[in-house]
Amino acid sequence: MSKDIKFNFLNSDEEERYQKHLTLKEIGYEGQINLKNSSVLCIGAGGLGSSVLLYLAAAGIGRIGIVDNDQVEKSNLQRQIIHETNTIGNLKIDSAKERIKKLNPNCEILTLSLIHI
């Protein structure tokens, strides 16, 4: 999704996925479109960031950026719920991206590791 593209509809998968949001007067169809057109940057995919990222993706944010410079360690797994045992040793940004895409394939994920700069 390019930042210049604005969506004005939900596809059938999104309508089913966000059915509860669509029935809420506080969100509704227009609100869900606004979420789809929104971008969020999360600095850190650790303790707090790991939970926030999952909720943002589940809510329907269209584009999420993740910045982190750390690798997944076994000791992270009890509190950083976005990461899994099979991602130990991977960059947290890659682990988080993989998990978010499983949760919501409609969400665009952009990553930046400060290690590579």
Where are the regions a protein language model picked out?
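Adenine nucleotide-associated cytosolic modules
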Residues: 1-115
